[in-house]
Amino acid sequence: MSEHSFVWDAVQRVRTGAPLVHNITNYVVMNTTANALLAAGASPVMAHAREEVEELAGLCSSLVLNIGTLSKPWIESMFAAGRIAQSRGVPVVLDPVGAGASSLRTWTSLDLLRELNISVLRGNASEILALSGAGSRTKGVDSIHQAADAADAARELAGKFGCVVVVSGAEDLITDGSSDVLVRGGHDMMPRITGMGCTATALVAAHAAVAGSVLDGAAAGMGVMAVAGTMASRKAKGPGSFQMHFIDALYGMQSFDVEAGVEIVR
C-alpha cells in the first residue's frame, strides 16, 4: 500500500458511509464547516443546546468539540455530549481554538482533556504549546509558531492523555506519542481564510469515524485538507474564490488528485 492509499481509502469510506458528525462548534464557522463536511460526503449536525446534545451524541459517528466561541452553557454541552460519545466508543475530536489567549480557553481545553477520553486533539502550534505548559501565547486565535516548534509538546500531550495530537501548519504533524506522520501540501493562502483550521478538525472527525485507526483517520483528514487546498490554489484568484474552489475540490476529489496533491511521510 502506498502512503497515499490510506487517504484515498478513507475518502471513499466517507463518501459511501456518510458518517454523522456532531459538531459543537463556533458561530464563526458553522456554515463553512457544514458545507465542507457535506462536500466530502459526511453528514453534519450542528447542535449545542444542552437539552439535546446527549440524544444527538447517541446517534453520531464522531463528535467535534470546538471552543472558538466559548460560553458556560456550551462548556456544559461539550462535557455532556462527550460522555455519551465516549461511552459509545466513537471518536471525540477537540479543537482548542485560542488556547493560550485566555485562561477560560486554556483551562476548558485542559479540563476536557482530563475528564473525557479525547481521541484527537487538533490545534495550531501555539495552542499545543500552551496546553503542554510551555508558556506560549497566541496572536488571538492565530499561531505565532510553526508545527515543528510544537513537536515535542505534541508527543508529550499524546502520551499524557492517550490521544492523537495534530499540529497544523505549513507542514502538519500527526502523532500518537510514538509514531509520527507528516503531511505536506495545501497553499499559503489557507491561513488568510477564517475557519480553515476548524474545517480541518471536522474533516479529521469524519475520516476518523471510518478509518482503521485514529492515527490513520487523523492523517487522512489532514491529507484531504492538503489535497483540497492544492486543488483550489490552481483556480483561485484570492481568499474568496479559494474558499469556493476548496469546497468544490472536496466534492470532486479523485485518486490522482490525492497522489499529486499531498506528500505523506511516516
UniProtKB/Swiss-Prot annotation:
* The keyword Nucleotide-binding is assigned to this record: yes
Organism domain of life: Bacteria
Q: Which residues bind ATP?
A: R122, S168
What one GO molecular function would you report for this record? magnesium ion binding
Kind of enzyme, top EC level? transferase
Q: Which SUPFAM superfamilies match?
A: Ribokinase-like (SSF53613)
**Pathway recorded for this protein:** Cofactor biosynthesis; thiamine diphosphate biosynthesis; 4-methyl-5-(2-phosphoethyl)-thiazole from 5-(2-hydroxyethyl)-4-methylthiazole: step 1/1
UniProt-recorded name of the protein = Hydroxyethylthiazole kinase
Annotated organism of origin: Oleidesulfovibrio alaskensis (strain ATCC BAA-1058 / DSM 17464 / G20) (Desulfovibrio alaskensis)
